[in-house]
């Protein structure tokens, strides 16, 4: 118990990061191969996709790679797929909640579709959530799937929540193009949670 989703998340993250590198090298065909691979979990992971998973990040970068290859119409279909999903920001507790990152990619896809107001609404929603909850005192008095992991590692729930809220603030600012504010928020996240892999990847991407 407590390890659900972690191997699958690392599998997808590794493929998406490799695809982003290929995009930066103008190897768009290779990027697409990697991203299409990320859409399907191999059997040896022993885990299927959660119901409702939208793969916003994968579809967004498929759109970017496809557009760079000159097929704007096909790219628009990927951006449409990347733009769907809930825009409600979840807390940091449960692996089956939609990750906040997916709202960032929804917004970026909205931009690509010419729907800037809808994209901005998602980015501001991320920032508002983070600012409203960053000082929350968090305690758990019930059992859930994520609870065993949290207990084994003796997690400080309030500290973990604070790190998550700064991360969410960073996501919103990154989407809006407020790079310094995003960098500041991501650094605050990492000062509280050095193992926040997604935050580190986004921050490293900003510094390239």
Regions found by a protein language model. Name each.
Residues 4, 11, 45, 55, ...:
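Residue-level recognition of tetratricopeptide repeat
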Residues 7, 14, 48, 58, ...:
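TPR alpha-solenoid repeat register
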Residues 1-8, 42-52, 88-95, 152-157:
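Flexible helix-coil transition and linker loops at the boundaries of alpha-helical arrays
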Residues 1, 36-47, 81-91, 127-128, ...:
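Amphipathic alpha-helical segments of tetratricopeptide repeats
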Residues 10, 17, 54, 60-61, ...:
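"A position-specific structural signal for the A-helix of alpha-solenoid helical repeats
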């Amino acid at each position: 118990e407590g390890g659900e989703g972690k191997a699958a998340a690392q599998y997808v993250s590794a493929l998406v990061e490799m695809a982003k590198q290929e995009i930066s090298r103008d190897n768009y065909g290779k990027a697409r191969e990697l991203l299409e691979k990320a859409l399907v979990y191999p059997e040896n992971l022993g885990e299927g996709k959660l119901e409702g998973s939208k793969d916003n990040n994968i579809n967004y970068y498929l759109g970017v790679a496809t557009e760079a290859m000159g097929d704007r119409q096909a790219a628009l279909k990927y951006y449409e797929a990347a733009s769907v999903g809930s825009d409600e920001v979840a807390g940091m507790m449960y692996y089956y909640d939609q990750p906040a990152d997916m709202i960032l990619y929804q917004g970026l896809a909205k931009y690509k579709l010419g729907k800037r107001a809808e994209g901005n609404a998602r980015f501001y929603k991320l920032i508002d959530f983070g600012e409203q909850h960053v000082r929350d005192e968090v305690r758990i008095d019930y059992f859930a799937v994520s609870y065993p992991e949290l207990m084994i590692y003796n997690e400080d729930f309030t500290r973990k929540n604070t790190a998550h809220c700064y991360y969410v603030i960073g996501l919103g600012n990154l989407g809006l193009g407020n790079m310094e504010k995003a960098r500041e928020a991501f650094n605050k996240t990492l000062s509280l949670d050095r193992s926040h892999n997604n935050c580190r990847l986004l921050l490293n991407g900003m510094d390239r």
